[in-house]
Structures are given as structure tokens and as C-alpha cells.
Amino acid sequence: MDTEGFGELLQQAEQLAAETEGISELPHVERNLQEIQQAGERLRSRTLTRTSQETADVKASVLLGSRGLDISHISQRLESLSAATTFEPLEPVKDTDIQGFLKNEKDNALLSAIEESRKRTFGMAEEYHRESMLVEWEQVKQRILHTLLASGEDALDFTQESEPSYVSDVSPPGRSSLDSIEMAYARQIYIYNEKIVSGHLQPNLVDLCASVAELDDKSISDMWAMVKQMTDVVLTPATDALKSRSSVEVRMDFVKQALGYLEQSYKNYTLVTVFGNLHQAQLGGVPGTYQLVRSFLNIKLPAPSPGLQDGEVEGHPVWALIYYCMRCGDLLAASQVVSRAQHQLGEFKTWFQEYMNSKDRRLSPATENKLRLHYRRALRNNTDPYKRAVYCIIGRCDITDNQSEVADKTEDYLWLKLNQVCFDDDGTSSPQDRLTLSQFQKQLLEDYGESHFTVNQQPFLYFQVLFLTAQFEAAIAFLFRMERLRCHAVHVALVLFELKLLLKSSGQSAQLLSHEPGDPPCMRRLNFVRLLMLYTRKFESTDPREALQYFYFLRDEKDSQGENMFLRCVSELVIESREFDMILGKLENDGSRKPGVIDKFTSDTKPIINKVASVAENKGLFEEAAKLYDLAKNADKVLELMNKLLSPVVPQISAPQSNKERLKNMALSIAERYRAQGISANKFVDSTFYLLLDLITFFDEYHSGHIDRAFDIIDRLKLVPLNQESMEERVAAFRNFSDEIRHNLSEVLLATMNILFTQFKRLKGTSPSSATRPQRVIEDRDSQLRSQARALITFAGMIPYRTSGDTNARLVQMEVLMN
């Protein structure tokens, strides 16, 4: 049967194929088995999708129908809903429909107002959001910058370090966080401050810091020599450093000092070169710069170079001799060369004599214009680089030519450009012949920048470039970013600060290096306070004495709230290091104060100690604050804080070395000393303090089982009523008690009731009446104890203080047991 069925199916398929082949208009599509299977799967999935949709509709109907909802009605209602929005354009009206026109105009006005208000609201919200994001981002940038600067790595060094340790990184006691160089600097700062505090003449901080350079490498020695040279200027009288630094006289002095440093450095370089090659140098003749330069040229220019002009002097090119004599800072030696070759040099001798004899190395305007004209006509494309360089220096012209054939090193380039800097504007100089110090500073700091000078390989070179162009703040900020050089940057800043040459930021929230509105374009300000605090953060916890020496430089600085920065830093240092006794002094047993390190800096230590105590109090360090206020003889604050400390521990059981035992001993020591010396505080605070001490004694006796002594104490204190007659008086007196006393009321009532209940049980447990103790006495005592217990219950209900429900329940329970 199956065979016949398959045969019939095959026959039908062949017939269908034959019919299909007969239709020539249709294209033939041949598919393999895999393609046929895929086509079948697609047809099946369509069928399943329709089926699944119908199944889903059925399930939805069942689900919603069980809740009483008709899905067909819901579908109709949804389809009938209009999708038109409120702000859909209004329907047009006929021109003669006045009512419709007025209605449309009114609706249009309302919709326009709403839309305009919506746009304005969204615009304001977006603007506020943008401003908020900018402010928040600026704060985040500040925090990132501070974190990077305060870290132990270079600001941009993100290399993977060793795995972090989760053990406390606090250094062991006695171990310093300062390395040998930092410690050497700290000693010099100590010596400097000792002289200042003692009233001696102000020592030279540059010399003190430079002595540390002997322990380090040559770069540090050169750096301090440069700092000493650049700070040796006469400041003009001014109210602040900005006016002084902006004056023409001071800026001219800076350039003069920088040239002097570069010239002396180059002379030292020629000496080292000559004495390192004596055979080739052939040093001889009269000692001096001229002979030194001749010998140097024997090494530098051993053979005649092509393009050099105007002959030779003693076998060396004239202009090379003149240039190198000037480079060594010896114009007299250069004039000797000019005199020997005057016949080949034309008018140059006259110009050079005028240049050499002028006060500020500047030709007169007429001579300068004449020289510049000669240079432009005959020398601009001259083949002798030394001749062009000398003319550009003397005439201060052609500032765009860097003279790279001669000035091939950064120091030579600096020397050449500083020689071309001019300060007076006579109106005759063209832009290509005029270079101001501000222009040169901008070129080095902004146009070239760090990337040009490969600061990672030669950090001191970039520092030198900035420092010699009087950009002290930028130089310090750059050096400070490098961990190994940070200590040098800080001490350079201290030197400039003490010499009143440092431009400081007007606020402590400013970045480390900033430009403030109103300052000249190339002036930068250094956040000196932040610089010092970032530096001391490394060692203030392990070396508080050294940190204190640095903070002394901030004695005249104020923060944004007008608070003295020295006081603020000292208070933070004491709290951080917990070296209260060492820094602020210690109170002896007789009440006298043993001086601390702070006494070296000021004779009146009370404001500082009070400030530290206030900070400790605000941080919740009440015990330390109380000791500090005691040190400052502030009895009111001492007892006020002691009351806060004693109140929570009053009802606790005393144990050796417990918190209560320590505070009790401290309070007793203060009480004994105050009574012996007649020291009194505010009456209210004073009475609270002594009442708390009495309550501590009461609870100590109570916990020790001495209930009779404890009862005598509570009876004498008159804190709670023990009879109905004193009820009103005790309730009225309770209103005058401080919170420190009130917080202990529940425990006092429970302890007193326990004492009464214990006495009651003891009375009931005694033998029957005897001759010595008649029945009447026992009954009277029994009645008295019940009356006292009832008085406590009544008192607890009358006072304006909410005791806990557990306390009331226990009081009532014991009172009931006594009845």
C-alpha cells in the first residue's frame, strides 16, 4: 500500500514538473535539499507566529476575564482614543466667524505663552545644569590635582607600583619620614627661625640652603648659585610684591643678574675646557679673559672656518674673539680685540665704545638706528655668524634670528635673547627689532613650554630657563611636581617669600600656579600656603617639630575667614600627631605649665592652645580638649567638657584601667587642684561638676554593696525626695539641673529604690522583736521605707523629664513588693 502511494506521488510530481517545463515564460528555479528545508522552516515559522499570536490573545482574554475585564471592549476603547495632542494646530475658521476667530486668537495667545514659558524653563534648567557640571568638574580637577601633588609619585607618573598593603602605613615611633637632604634643609630652617625668634639680624636664607647643596649633586649647587644671583636685587619701595616685580628698575636688574650668571657660567665652562686640554689649548701670555678665549678657540676652532670675515688677530677670527669675550662677560677684553682690528671694522669701534660705556648697555637712539640700518643693508645675509651675532646684540636688532650657528645651546640662546631685551619704547624701533621681557617670557612658558625642553630628561634646564627670565613661580611649580626635587622647590619658594619677591595667590583655594585678573599677562602667582602644607603633609605625623618650623613662615598669613594660618596649621598638626605635651607643653602636678616647642615662637601661648582645644572639641575629642583648656587656664571650658565626659560613665561599674576609672581620676585631680588653688568656674557648671563627682562616689559605693553609705550620700545630695514634705522642693530644684544630671536620673532612681528594697528585705529577714529592738521600732522603720519608696514613685511622675518605660515598671514593681 505504501509502495503504491509513493509511486502515485512520484507520478504526480513528474507530471507537475513536465507541465512546469512547458511554460516557457516562467524562469526555472532549481533547489537542493538544504534550500528546500530552509524554505519549509520559514513557512512553518510564519504559521507558528500566527498561531502564537492567537494563543497569546486567548491567554490575555482568560487573564483579564478572570478580573472582570472584557478585552474586546478594551480594544475598541483604545482604538477610539484620539492621538491628537493639546498643542495641535487649531482648526481654521471662516473669515466671518467672529466668535471662532476670537476663540482661536485667545487659544493661540495662551498656547504661545505656554510654549514660550516651556522653552525658557528648559533653557534655564539646561543652563543651570551646565553651570553646575562645570563647577563640579572644576572641584574634581582641584581634588585630582591636590591628590597628585601630595602623592609620593610624580604628577603624571601612572606606572604600576607594588601591591598595596592593607596594614597601617603609620611609621613606627621614632622613625623619620625625611630623607637626608630634607633633614639637612630642615636643620637650616631651624637655624634660620632660631635667629629670627631670638631677635638677631635676619640671616641669609639663601646661604643656609645653598650649604645643603654640598651634600647633593652639581645641578643642585648650580641651582642655588643661580637663585642667589637672581635674588641679589634692590627692590623698589612698594606695598606688595606685584608692584615691586612690575617696576622697570627691578625687571632690568633681573635681566642684568641673569646675564651675569650666564656669563660667569660660560667662563667657568671655558676654564674647565682649557685646563682639560692644555696641550691643544696652548695657554700662555698675560692671564685674563683674552688669553683664555684665545686658548679656548684653539680647541673650538682649530682650523680656519669658511665664511669668517675681517681678518684675524693672533691667528684667530676677529669676530669669534669679540663674541666669546662678550660671552664670558668681559667687554674690556672684547675692546682689546676691537682696538687691534679697528682698521678692518670701520665704524664698529665707535659703536662698541658707546655700548661699553653706557649704563644699561644701550646705544643712543640715533646710533642704534644707524647700526640697524647698516645691519639690514650689509649684514643680514652675511656669512660670518659671529659678526651677525655681535651686531644683533649691540644693536638689539633682528630678534627673529636665533643665531643657531653660534648659540647652539639653550644657555647661549638665553644669553643672546636677554641681551636683546629692551625696556624703553622710543617709538623708533620696528617690531622685528623690539623684544620685551614679557614677550620673551610668554615665548618660553607658553609657546615652547615643557615639551620643547624635554623636561623629563633635563628638569633643571627648564627650571633654569624659567628662573633666569624672572618666572620664579612657574619654575617652582614645575620643580615641585617632581617628587625627588620637591624639597628644593619648596626651599627656593621660602627664600623668595622671605625676600618679598614671591607673588602669592590671593586665596588658599587657588591652584598651585594661577593667573589672577588684573595681573600682567606673563605674571603667575604661586599658592605658597598650599605648597608648604603639601610638603609638610609627608612628615608632619612623624616629625612634628620640623613641620612646626615650616609653619612659622605662615605667621603673617590669613585664610579666607581671616584666621591666622600659623594657628590653624599648628592646631591641625597637634591634632594629627597627638603630640600635645611636646608641642604645647604639659601641666605639672602643682599646676604650673612645662613649656613646649611652641613657646619658642611666641610668648603668649594661650591663643594657640585655646585654638587647638577648640579644634579638638569640634572634632569630638573632648578629653584632649579638656586637657588643653586646662593648659590654657580656661576653667569654664574644662569643667564644661568634663561634665560631658563624666555624665555617660556615672552609673557604670568601676574597673581597673576602664574608661570610667581614667575619667574619674582625671576629674578628681582637677577638683583637688582647683580647690587647692582657689580656681572657680561658672557657678552652674561648677556645681554640676562636683555633683557628678558625688554621684560617681554614690554609684561606686552602691556597686560595692555598701548600701548604707550609698544611702547616706544620696540623702545628703538632696537630689531625690525621701519624704513627702520635700517633694515640692526637689521637683522645683530638678528644673535647675543640667542635662548631664538629668540623663542619670533613671539610674539614680533605680539605685535608690534598690537600696530601699534591700533595706526592706533585710528588715523583714531580721529576728522578731527584742528588748533592744521593740516591735514598734521595726514597724516605724517599715513604714518609713514604704513612704520613701512611694515618694520616689511620685517624684518620677512629677518631674518634667521622660524616663523610660522599663525604669517606671521596675520602680513600681519594687514598690509593690515592699507593700
Curated annotation (Swiss-Prot):
Compartments it resides in: Nucleus membrane; Nucleus, Nuclear pore complex; Nucleus envelope
Membrane topology: Peripheral membrane protein
GO BP term, example: nuclear pore complex assembly
Keyword Protein transport listed: yes
Modified residues (Phosphothreonine): 49
Sequence similarity: Belongs to the nucleoporin interacting component (NIC) family.
Protein's name according to its UniProt entry: Nuclear pore complex protein Nup93
Annotated organism of origin: Rattus norvegicus (Rat)
Gene responsible for this protein: Nup93
